[in-house]
Swiss-Prot record:
Any Pfam family the entry gives: TT_ORF2-like
Keyword flag Phosphoprotein: yes
Positions with biased composition (Basic residues): 222-241
Signal peptide span: none
Keyword terms, alphabetized: Phosphoprotein
Source organism superkingdom: Viruses
Stretches that traverse the bilayer: none
Protein name in the entry: Probable protein VP2
Low complexity bias (residue ranges): 242-265
Region of interest (Disordered), residue spans: 67-108, 183-286
Modifications made to the protein after synthesis: Phosphorylated at C-terminal serines.
Length: 286
């Protein structure tokens, strides 16, 4: 359904005129906008209408002006690399080079090498090995395990971690032996541990007995002890120890024999011989 416009022609003209005044007041400070508009209309010509369409006209082409010649200095001008030397300036060998003739100069070889190097840089190298799609979980696990870094040590036990662990284990053993020694020393303050130099190769270790020895009887254990005692005596004669150690060992053996003879007559019960397990250290000091 058609409805008449809300604003009539007079109101539209008034809006257009007020917009012209507002735009003039925004850009110019003169009091008369109409006189300003008439002055511009007289100075500036109205835009011409485009020419009517007609047959296509062949307009003449304008030639570009020639550029001024550059000042030339003697000896500063270098020959064109593709012209084949100084003759290219006159058009002799230069024409042949432009039409595909071989110049044969060192500059041409350098230029060709530079072009080949630039083309090589533009090429994208292929990846080796060629990547392939992972289709299953098993393939992913196999690729991951194959690319892991293995231990680079060829001989086991030569790494820094293993050597440090061994040193720590040795120090712990030494500390444990010292702790055991001090505990036994506190329990038996009267007893003094005996330490001697290690025996030679091929010889048996000597067994040290505590001052308080027990009795023995004619049981099988007593027989084995007597055999051990005879072996110790023979071993002492072979190695010939120092007078101090021999006297102490002899006194210990005699006391052990006297105690064993006296205790055998009193009772038939056998007691174990207490062997000191104190560690032996060298170097004169703990």
């Amino acid at each position: 359904m058609w409805t008449p416009p809300r604003n009539d022609q007079h109101y539209l003209n008034w809006q257009w005129y007020s917009s012209i005044l507002s735009s003039h007041a925004a850009m110019c400070g003169c009091p008369d906008a109409v006189a300003h508009f008439n002055h511009l209309a007289s100075v500036l010509r109205a835009p011409q209408n485009p020419p009517p369409p007609g047959p296509q006209r062949n307009l003449p082409l304008r030639r570009l002006p020639a550029l001024p010649a550059a000042p030339e200095a003697p000896g500063d001008r270098a020959p064109w690399p593709m012209a084949g030397g100084a003759e290219g300036e006159d058009g002799g060998a230069g024409g042949d080079a432009d039409h595909g003739g071989a110049a044969g100069g060192p500059e041409d070889a350098d230029l060709l090498d530079a072009v080949a190097a630039a083309e090589t840089l533009l090429e994208i190298p292929a990846k080796k090995p060629t990547p392939r799609a992972i289709e299953s979980l098993e393939a992913y696990k196999s690729l991951t395990r194959n690319t892991t870094h293995r231990n680079s040590h060829s001989i086991p036990g030569t790494s820094d971690v293993v050597s440090l662990a061994r040193k720590l284990f040795r120090e712990c053993n030494n500390n444990q032996q010292l702790l055991t020694f001090f505990q036994q020393a506190t329990r038996d303050p009267g007893g003094t541990p005996r330490c001697t130099t290690p025996a030679k190769k091929g010889s048996k270790k000597k067994a040290y007995f505590s001052p308080q020895s027990s009795s023995s009887d004619e049981s099988p254990r007593g027989k084995t002890r007597s055999r051990r005692k005879a072996g110790r005596k023979a071993q002492r004669k072979r190695h010939r120890p120092s007078p101090s150690s021999s006297s102490s060992s002899c006194s210990n053996s005699e006391s052990w024999e006297s105690n064993s003879d006296s205790s055998s007559t009193k009772s038939k019960k056998s007691n174990k011989i207490k062997i000191s397990t104190l560690p032996c250290y060298q170097g004169g000091g703990i």
